[in-house]
């Protein structure tokens, strides 16, 4: 039995050893679990000496080490390949495939749950393909950890022969599990909320691209029937994403719809348009629009074909805008349930759009051990170029990580440059680098790096305070 509860959490299967475990052995096992990879076969002489002094044979510790089951899962669409290893490279079961059906996933969960000793399961975060497997194993009460595929890709490349197959990848993930046993982070219910938020952000990005493309297409069409109509109004978009100039172009899609009917008739129709769409009617606006239309040159004639094309494009744009605004609201509502929401929203330059996007792409900050880990995750950290006497003083950003996160960071940097808040440290840093003549991408990337460091510190402190309060 183990005398200290804090040690029982660390030592795990050592509780099965009948003879009381002394402090030297606890220290020895702690050294093996934290300092040494679990797949190392031999026990160092220092540990053997500590065990002899404690009166425990080395076979006891070897038996304990065999009670660690590392499960590596290589996920693909519709099926996964599973490998189960123990320390020392012991193969519990050769890699096998499991299809993503309810029955097969439940059978897999039962099998993994029946393994003796401590079992940890690791899989890569592969888009959406891993979610059925993750859901089944998490609901079965098993220890599941989802890791960045980049970590697995660069792990264990110590062979001249490059093998790329599902069984080989599953074994590699299992070896990664053994080497990082103590540092693995268990998937939790809060991760489910973050997964939903990241999925919403992915859809938000998709529909935003559609909206931008639809708007560009509409403006290109209108330039041939009503040039410059998109610049006639400066009203901001509504909560549903609709814009006044778009609604106006639907009713008055051609310049002849304005100038051919006379000022009086156009004024009446414009007034009816404002009433229908709940816009404020301005007395002088119809005359300005009418006079401006006289000087415009329409390339396309006023025919039904062009009217159909323009109005269909407007419907498509309004639909995409509606999706974008709906997703924006859902993201903000979901992000507000996370503990760091108020802290993130309090950072200058972060609003109801960028805040949820940051939280979605960064995820749980507690999984990053230091600030540099977060900047490396975002790909805004400077690379290292040193060899022998050569030490480069200026290196390119790594750009490894979430491209959507880097895009959001650059948008925040743009907001800071536009608003120029003198009391904001990130803006002062940006302005300093810009004044030094640094290229655009250099000072924007450096500003994003500094912003993430501040983000990390504030959110980390927020989570720490919440833990202490509990």
Per-segment meaning from a language model:
Residues 2, 13-18, 28-30:
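Short, low-complexity, intrinsically disordered N-terminal modules
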Residues 4-7:
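Intrinsic-disorder-associated, low-complexity terminal segments enriched in Asp/Asn/His/Tyr and depleted
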Residues 9-12, 79:
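N-terminal compositionally biased or targeting/leader segments
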Residues 22-470:
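A detector of single, family-specific signature residues
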């Amino acid at each position: 039995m183990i005398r200290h509860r804090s040690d029982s959490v660390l030592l795990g299967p050592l509780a099965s050893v009948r003879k009381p475990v002394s402090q030297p052995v606890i220290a020895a096992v702690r050294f093996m679990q934290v300092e040494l990879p679990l797949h190392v076969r031999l026990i160092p002489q220092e540990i053997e000496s500590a065990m002899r002094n404690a009166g425990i044979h080395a076979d006891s510790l070897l038996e304990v080490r065999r009670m660690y089951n590392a499960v590596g899962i290589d996920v693909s669409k519709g099926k996964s390949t599973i490998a189960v290893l123990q320390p020392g490279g012991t193969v519990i079961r050769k890699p096998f495939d499991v299809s993503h059906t309810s029955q097969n996933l439940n059978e897999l969960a039962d099998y993994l749950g029946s393994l003796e000793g401590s079992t940890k399961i690791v899989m890569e975060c592969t888009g959406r393909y891993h979610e059925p497997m993750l859901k089944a194993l998490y609901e079965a009460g098993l220890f599941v950890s989802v890791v960045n595929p980049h970590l697995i890709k660069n792990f264990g490349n110590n062979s001249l022969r490059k093998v790329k197959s599902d069984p080989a990848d599953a074994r590699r993930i299992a070896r990664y599990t053994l080497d990082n046993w103590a540092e693995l982070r268990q998937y939790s219910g809060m991760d489910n909320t973050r997964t939903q938020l990241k999925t919403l952000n992915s859809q938000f990005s998709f529909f935003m691209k559609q909206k931008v493309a639809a708007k560009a297409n509409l403006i290109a069409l209108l330039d041939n029937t009503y040039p410059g109509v998109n610049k006639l109004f400066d009203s901001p978009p509504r909560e549903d994403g609709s814009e006044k100039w778009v609604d106006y172009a639907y009713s008055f899609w051609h310049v002849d719809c304005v100038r051919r009917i006379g000022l009086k008739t156009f004024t009446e129709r414009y007034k009816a348009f404002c009433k229908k769409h709940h816009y404020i009617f301005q007395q002088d606006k119809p005359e300005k629009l009418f006079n401006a239309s006289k000087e415009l040159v329409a390339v396309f004639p006023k025919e039904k074909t062009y009217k159909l094309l323009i109005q269909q494009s407007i419907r498509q744009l309004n639909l995409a805008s509606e999706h974008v605004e709906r997703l924006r609201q859902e993201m903000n509502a979901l992000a507000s349930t996370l503990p760091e929401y108020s802290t993130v929203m309090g950072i200058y330059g972060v609003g109801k759009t960028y805040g949820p996007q940051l939280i979605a792409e960064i995820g749980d900050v507690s999984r990053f051990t230091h600030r540099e880990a977060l900047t490396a995750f975002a790909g805004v950290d400077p690379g290292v170029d040193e060899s022998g006497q050569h030490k480069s003083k200026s290196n390119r950003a790594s750009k490894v990580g979430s491209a959507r996160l880097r895009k959001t960071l650059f948008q925040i940097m743009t907001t800071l440059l536009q608003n120029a808040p003198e009391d904001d440290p990130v803006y002062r840093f940006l302005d300093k680098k810009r004044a030094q003549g640094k290229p655009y991408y250099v000072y924007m990337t450096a500003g994003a790096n500094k912003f993430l460091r501040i983000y990390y510190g504030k959110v980390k402190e927020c989570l720490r305070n919440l833990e202490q309060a509990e």
